[in-house]
């Protein structure tokens, strides 16, 4: 399957026109939303980008890793390369499929 996961920093539910926003038109995102799956009841585990991405990729709460906080662009990896992550699980699932 083709999966496109878009993670946008500081994007709220009402910021895209496909969800009813009228201040800014977002035709590209609207098209993707209309041709794919739209989620209308989601939540995030953290209010900051690094912590949210950490949780999404690992399935863990960000507070389980004290390094999952706002970090500069040159920061060291905060996810151990041996740790199970969403991309690894998806890749393994495709191999078994």
Residue ranges and their predicted role:
Residues 1-97:
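Formylglycine-dependent sulfatase
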